[in-house]
Amino acid sequence: RRLRPEAIVEAKKELGFAYEWVATPVSKAKKDLLDRFPELTDAVGAETRDGLTLVRFGLFNLTKEIVTKNQFKHPIKIRFPADTMILSARFGEALKMERKSTAEPVVNESLVLIPAESMNPRSTLIYNLILRGNAVPDSVIGEIEGKGHIDRVH
């Protein structure tokens, strides 16, 4: 008796809620990236831009369902090393959805709190961070009711 192919295919893990970030030193940023950070002049002013890093932090609803803001157990917490100075944290853009909230991230020393927002299936919210110092987060913590902990996209 032969096994049917579908009998040996493992069930795929359902995609969930995830994040990813990309850090680019200002000195290496191309015009199209700089254009996505109109707040750069306000955040830095006449100060030197040496050592500044632009971070695009994306939240992804990879499920086939709407995730409501009430499903967030708490705001997404992005913790940077203590010596990292967070000069700005702002909403950047929404993909595959219309953003209904005007809430902005909150900065508390080396911590950025991303506010809970409803997200459409397969949608993305991108936040712009301007940092001086180490741009690699120590941790990213978040949990969505019914979806579990937020994971980094690999």
Region spans (language model):
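Proline/serine/threonine-rich low-complexity linkers at boundaries of modular beta-sandwich domains
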Residues: 12, 23-33
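Hydrophobic, helix-forming membrane-interacting segments
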Residues: 1-22
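Extracellular adhesion/glycan-binding regions together with long Ser/Thr-
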Residues: 99-123
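Short, well-ordered beta-strand segments enriched in hydrophobic/aromatic residues
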Residues: 53-61, 122
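Asparagine-centered strand-capping/turn motif at beta-strand->loop junctions
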Residues: 59-72, 80
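Solvent-exposed beta-hairpin/edge-strand motifs
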Residues: 72-96
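Short, solvent-exposed beta-strand/turn "edge" segments of beta-rich domains on protein surfaces
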Residues: 29-54, 65-70, 118
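Extended, hydrophilic extramembrane loops/domains of integral membrane proteins
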Residues: 117-154
